[in-house]
Regions:
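NTP/phosphate- and nucleic-acid-binding module
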Residues: 1-176
């Protein structure tokens, strides 16, 4: 609109108009007018707000037993998610935290990881969904037997068994 220039002209007591010699449909000069101004603005805060607004989702579904469930998930694209991977030992005992810590140490020099052993695994998955972590790896008793882990994908909630040695490459390929 011409609001900014009109207000500036009003308070500065100077004319800020454009004279146009072109002719209108009636054959008369268009004359003086205050031009409209298009103000574009791009800033990091607006970009960040846009990403967060688009990423925030509340999902609802019906479980197999017929009950309703829901979750809050930040579907931040994996490449810009602040935390790429959560490493979650199933229990705080039986050597699982030690394996998880070792895996954490292997991955943390390549991307930001988060380690958590508090609460049930389902609650930990939900917390990671809410902060936008695209991958969760669960270290369980089977990990001790065959060196595989369960990887969970945030967007689909799909889980699969993979070799512990593949975790870093899978996450790096998706995120970096």
């Amino acid at each position: 609109t011409d609001f900014d220039l009109s207000q500036h002209a009003k308070y500065s007591k100077k004319k800020i108009q454009y004279f146009d010699n072109d002719l209108n449909e009636e054959g008369k000069p268009i004359g003086n007018y205050t031009p409209f101004v298009v103000e574009t603005s791009v800033g990091l805060d607006r970009l960040f707000l846009t990403v967060i607004s688009l990423a925030y989702q509340e999902e609802k579904w019906t479980k197999e037993d017929g009950s309703e469930d829901s979750r809050v998930v930040m579907k931040i694209p994996a490449k810009i998610a602040p935390t790429k991977l959560a490493i979650l030992p199933l229990l705080k005992k039986d050597g699982l935290p030690e394996i998880a810590t070792q895996s954490m140490n292997e991955c943390k020099s390549h991307f930001h990881c988060f380690y958590e052993e508090k609460d049930a695994i389902g609650k930990r998955y939900r917390r990671m969904d809410a902060i936008g972590t695209p991958f969760c790896v669960t270290i369980d008793h089977q990990t001790k037997e065959d060196n595989t882990v369960t990887i969970r994908y945030r967007d689909t909630m799909k889980q699969e068994r993979i070799a512990l040695s593949e975790v870093k490459d899978i996450v790096a390929k998706a995120c970096c």
